[in-house]
């Protein structure tokens, strides 16, 4: 499901390990605005009214928030923004479903996934889409819940601690 836009982003991102971490580049908020700009064109992003305009090539000064707000715009820009955010959610769900299915859970289970990031917690409908898609992709006896890290502890440390307990 990766596109020529993903390929270009990967090839031109010399500091971002070309050829590696392809899924992360397709789903992470860090890259969303740049992919959007590659789809609609930099000029189209810059030509938007001031409240909506952004430079998709501005590196760390641009982010998924620029794209998520465009879902409320109109026309093709809103359609592309919606499709891109939905694709991020669906690819995230597919990757997580693969991990869950690899566990070969044969009895009823509730699986909790600790998620962090602005797409999950600041993008309307994103978490729900990931959760819904995950539940469709996993066996019916497995219920998946996306959990928010409400502590000040980095989610990676929490995950490492949980893995160490297994």
Give residue ranges: language-model regions:
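ATP-binding/phosphotransfer module of carbohydrate and carboxylate kinases, centering on a glycine-rich
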Residues: 4-166
């Amino acid at each position: 499901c990766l596109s020529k836009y993903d390929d270009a982003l990967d090839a031109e991102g010399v500091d971002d390990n070309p050829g590696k971490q392809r899924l992360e580049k397709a789903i992470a908020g860090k890259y969303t605005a740049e992919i959007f700009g590659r789809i609609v064109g930099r000029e189209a992003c810059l030509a938007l009214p001031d409240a909506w305009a952004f430079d998709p090539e501005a590196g760390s000064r641009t982010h998924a928030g620029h794209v998520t707000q465009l879902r409320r715009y109109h026309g093709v820009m809103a359609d592309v923004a919606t499709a891109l955010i939905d694709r991020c959610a669906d690819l995230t769900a597919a990757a997580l479903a693969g991990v869950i299915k690899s566990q070969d859970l044969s009895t009823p289970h509730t699986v909790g996934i600790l998620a962090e990031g602005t797409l999950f917690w600041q993008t309307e409908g994103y978490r729900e889409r990931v959760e819904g898609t995950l539940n469709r992709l996993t066996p019916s006896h497995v219920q998946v819940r996306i959990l928010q890290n409400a502590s000040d502890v980095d989610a990676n440390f929490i995950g490492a601690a949980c893995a160490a307990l297994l």
